[in-house]
Amino acid sequence: MNDEGDLLQEDTARDEVNETEASRMSKLRKTRKKVTKPHDYSTEVGEMDISNSNERIRSQMLCHQLGDTSKPVAGPSSSETRVSQDDKDSPDQTMVMKPLPPQTASVPSGEHNTNSDCTRDSTQILTPPQLSSRMKHIKQEMAKNHLQFVQFEASDLHGVSRSKSIPAHFFQEKVIHGVFMPRGYLELIPNPKDNEVNHIRATCFNNDIVLMPELSTFRVLPWAERTARVICDTFTVTGEPLLTSPRYIAKRQLNQLQDCGFSLLSAFIYDFCIFGVPEIINSKTISFAASTLVNNHDQPFMQELVDGLYHTGASVESFSSSTRPGQMEICFLPEFGISSADNAFTLRTGVKEVARKYNYIASFFIETGFCNSGILSHSLWDVDGKKNMFCNSSGVEQLTIIGKKWLAGLLKHSAALSCLMAPAVSCRKRYSKETKDLKESVPTTWGYNDNSCAFNIKCHGDKGARIENKLGSATANPYLVLAATVAAGLDGLQSNLDDLAGPDDSTDLFQSEPSEIPLKLEDALVALEEDECLREALGETFIRYFVAMKKYELENEETDAERNKFLEYFI
């Protein structure tokens, strides 16, 4: 009798799971039109009507005070007002912010709400009392730590932190009005007119943009003396979000995921190398001939780095030396929403700051391309962050239908994904290291608990099934890696890929046309330009700028060989 009762309970549970997934897939089909609504790019930065710009930018700044509240450190959490505005549907309309409720991404059980989608940049409205309360807590932190400066940081297209340091007594004023920075610092193209990016708006390249801080990211920097930092989103001086901003693009994709009833739990796993600093460095003899200094016995450096990252809100799950001398691996604790990319962004600067104290050079840019993997481990959860949608109740090495469709999307777009995730010539050497044959491309591989695959499915561990996207190198911008992965996975969910996914109890994934990863960056750029899904998801403006930047780098690869050696200082 007990066996029969257990079987009945299992059947009932299985029926409930099937009904839940069927309901969710039905919701995906209903919302497909909504979340795939194309941009109207006839009106972009630099072209909008600038009448009443002061009123618009003041309204924009007020909308941006709270930002991402995934890690509140100053001020209490609060419910925010949701304001509905029209989408940007015509050249004569100006994009208006539509605030969303804050996200809580610190634990899997928290609610997850991202901040923007394709047709709006959504941020939370902070009422004057809330702003006063949050600023009060930040001022207490500043006084307690005797802070003198606050760095307003934003990510450029390479994922390098670009910042301006503000004296502490001007912080509150800059929170309200923002910090101005030349647009060219973030877009990194000598001149868009020279690269045929945007003839009409070429003068916009030399304009200023505005860095607006997300106060929830305010942290005291352990590796900088009496200095704090705050991560910023970027806007034009008329209050429009900068469409080439990697963080804005990532938040937009996460919001589309939320619209479909899902949230993303993710973490980055990075390899980087530590070198000794040569005694003499100049533009002609620069080298890293000093013996590698970091190995299993050099713990103080890594311990200080991990402790510093913890105090900036980035929790490290583990670290170790890796396969080669001087190569280190660091794994972050999974978090919901944009937090995982923020953590990776913090690491990229923090590791260099700590390395300097030890007279080391830390680099994610390795010319050989073999020591710089950047893995995005991720899983799909329900919107409340309570159920892993990749997991079957059986616990065996097997994905759900939703998981298989997500994986199918990653495989389908792997060629274009590789362009964003291995964005330098040296990065792509990793793809061909297992073969000696001269090929134009290699197959995109996937498997269960197989670390040699491009997409490695791991079903062990307390968080359940997850997919490791191993296409990425540590050189890639973490915000773009996150955004592109979500965009490709969403396309898999929204496409009619039932035949591709196969039955629920199967571990196979049938592909009518096996996907390939181009070995040459030039071919990957073509794949990105021809991928309509990613073009629409990431935005036409961003794709044009990114492709132009990479083509410029390829054209100047030989003459810039000397300059590329200095990239080890910055990337």
Swiss-Prot record:
InterPro entries linked to this entry: Gln_synt_N, Gln_synt_N_sf, Gln_synth/guanido_kin_cat_dom, Gln_synth_cat_dom
GO biological process: glutamine biosynthetic process
One Pfam assignment: Gln-synt_C
GO cellular component annotations of the record: cytoplasm; membrane
Biased composition (Polar residues): 103-129
Entry's Gene Ontology molecular function annotations: glutamine synthetase activity
Subunit details: Dodecamer. Interacts with BFSP2 and VIM.
Main function: May act as a component of the cytoskeleton or as a chaperone for the reorganization of intermediate filament proteins during terminal differentiation in the lens. Does not seem to have enzymatic activity.
Family stated for the protein in its record: Belongs to the glutamine synthetase family.
Name of the protein described by the UniProt record: Lengsin
Organism: Oryctolagus cuniculus
Name of the gene: LGSN
